[in-house]
Amino acid sequence: MKILVDENMPYARDLFSRLGEVTAVPGRPIPVAQLADADALMVRSVTKVNESLLAGKPIKFVGTATAGTDHVDEAWLKQAGIGFSAAPGCNAIAVVEYVFSSLLMLAERDGFSLHERTVGIVGVGNVGRRLQARLEALGIKTLLCDPPRADRGDEGDFRSLDELVQRADILTFHTPLFKDGPYKTLHLADEKLIRSLKPGAILINACRGAVVDNTALLTCLNEGQKLSVVLDVWEGEPELNVELLTKVDIGTPHIAGYTLEGKARGTTQVFEAYSKFIGHKQHVALDTLLPAPEFGRITLHGPLDQPTLKRLVHLVYDVRRDDAPLRKVAGIPGEFDKLRKNYLERREWSSLYVICDDASAASLLCKLGFNAVHHPAR
């Protein structure tokens, strides 16, 4: 049994070698010749999986180690009788922590408290729900918009997108990309929406590039609209609008979900799905794969305020480490993908063990996802 795995899927070689012969291949462009005798294909979001790639090939199963699936033609796979699995929620924590790192940087730079801001969350799936929970744990007001979930009657106080635009100081997008249909998200943030944002608002896109109309956004920024922008995703990736990059406050190369934990979850989820598919069901404990974190433990004295939280968050991950490299190489062919391929190891907040002498600080840090304990001062 021959299994092709994306070369940037951590732990894929070791795990899938339990099931067959493993060959690691680049995801963009994928070497088509390798598909001629392969039984399974494990990809990431950079690989377009469709009829033109797989027609006439012996592939029986496709797994994507990503939460999003808009790069996969699921309907064609089903029609062709090819098994499929994604990894829903695998990088949700990573994306939430990316948003926090960005907001805390902007708050420090511009001198505001997040408690004074209302955050509008567009898309309340695995990422949006976790973001809501962490923001509300800090006492920060949130507004939720998710028309599909509202129409299904899912639990939640869902508001219209127009209301979020009118009331939110921070608008952050966490939707799939739907190019048509009743819940179309292509250019959901169009010129009209962008112009309607509150003066000084913060716009964040960490889902799919085309959810925000990049041309319209650049037009508004060039005309002097007072707006802070965080973009991790871009229309036309791996190409991007270099002029737009110069105008945004934070720009990164589609790495919001790139924690080691998130990548490992993606790999293990598709490994478990494929092992079940072939009748050799296996389970992998994530903590048996992950290395020891760079910072083993830290002691925190006193309560948790915003400056202290910012220091803890940026100790684990400071978004500026990914902004600067992109600006240096933007526009150079191949460099966007190279930044992603050679991405520095990044951990989640849970990797940091925090000893607190304040019980409320320990409790709050646990709610935020840190590994915190209360040890009273002696």
UniProtKB/Swiss-Prot annotation:
<dbReference type="GO" id="GO:0008615">
    <property type="term" value="P:pyridoxine biosynthetic process"/>
</dbReference>
<dbReference type="GO" id="GO:0005829">
    <property type="term" value="C:cytosol"/>
</dbReference>
<dbReference type="InterPro" id="IPR020921">
    <property type="entry name" value="Erythronate-4-P_DHase"/>
</dbReference>
<feature type="binding site">
    <location>
        <position position="66"/>
    </location>
    <ligand>
        <name>substrate</name>
    </ligand>
</feature>
<keyword id="KW-0963">Cytoplasm</keyword>
<keyword id="KW-0664">Pyridoxine biosynthesis</keyword>
<dbReference type="InterPro" id="IPR038251">
    <property type="entry name" value="PdxB_dimer_sf"/>
</dbReference>
<keyword id="KW-0520">NAD</keyword>
<dbReference type="Pfam" id="PF11890">
    <property type="entry name" value="DUF3410"/>
</dbReference>
<dbReference type="InterPro" id="IPR024531">
    <property type="entry name" value="Erythronate-4-P_DHase_dimer"/>
</dbReference>
<comment type="function">
    <text>Catalyzes the oxidation of erythronate-4-phosphate to 3-hydroxy-2-oxo-4-phosphonooxybutanoate.</text>
</comment>
<keyword id="KW-0560">Oxidoreductase</keyword>
<feature type="active site">
    <location>
        <position position="208"/>
    </location>
</feature>
<dbReference type="GO" id="GO:0051287">
    <property type="term" value="F:NAD binding"/>
</dbReference>
<comment type="similarity">
    <text>Belongs to the D-isomer specific 2-hydroxyacid dehydrogenase family. PdxB subfamily.</text>
</comment>
<feature type="binding site">
    <location>
        <position position="257"/>
    </location>
    <ligand>
        <name>NAD(+)</name>
    </ligand>
</feature>
<feature type="active site" description="Proton donor">
    <location>
        <position position="254"/>
    </location>
</feature>
<comment type="subunit">
    <text>Homodimer.</text>
</comment>
<dbReference type="InterPro" id="IPR006140">
    <property type="entry name" value="D-isomer_DH_NAD-bd"/>
</dbReference>
<protein>
    <recommendedName>
        <fullName>Erythronate-4-phosphate dehydrogenase</fullName>
        <ecNumber>1.1.1.290</ecNumber>
    </recommendedName>
</protein>
<feature type="binding site">
    <location>
        <position position="258"/>
    </location>
    <ligand>
        <name>substrate</name>
    </ligand>
</feature>
<dbReference type="InterPro" id="IPR036291">
    <property type="entry name" value="NAD(P)-bd_dom_sf"/>
</dbReference>
<dbReference type="InterPro" id="IPR029753">
    <property type="entry name" value="D-isomer_DH_CS"/>
</dbReference>
<dbReference type="GO" id="GO:0046983">
    <property type="term" value="F:protein dimerization activity"/>
</dbReference>
<dbReference type="Pfam" id="PF00389">
    <property type="entry name" value="2-Hacid_dh"/>
</dbReference>
<feature type="binding site">
    <location>
        <position position="232"/>
    </location>
    <ligand>
        <name>NAD(+)</name>
    </ligand>
</feature>
<feature type="binding site">
    <location>
        <position position="146"/>
    </location>
    <ligand>
        <name>NAD(+)</name>
    </ligand>
</feature>
<dbReference type="Pfam" id="PF02826">
    <property type="entry name" value="2-Hacid_dh_C"/>
</dbReference>
<dbReference type="InterPro" id="IPR006139">
    <property type="entry name" value="D-isomer_2_OHA_DH_cat_dom"/>
</dbReference>
<feature type="binding site">
    <location>
        <position position="45"/>
    </location>
    <ligand>
        <name>substrate</name>
    </ligand>
</feature>
<dbReference type="GO" id="GO:0033711">
    <property type="term" value="F:4-phosphoerythronate dehydrogenase activity"/>
</dbReference>
<dbReference type="GO" id="GO:0036001">
    <property type="term" value="P:'de novo' pyridoxal 5'-phosphate biosynthetic process"/>
</dbReference>
<feature type="active site">
    <location>
        <position position="237"/>
    </location>
</feature>
<dbReference type="InterPro" id="IPR029752">
    <property type="entry name" value="D-isomer_DH_CS1"/>
</dbReference>
<comment type="pathway">
    <text>Cofactor biosynthesis; pyridoxine 5'-phosphate biosynthesis; pyridoxine 5'-phosphate from D-erythrose 4-phosphate: step 2/5.</text>
</comment>
<feature type="binding site">
    <location>
        <position position="175"/>
    </location>
    <ligand>
        <name>NAD(+)</name>
    </ligand>
</feature>
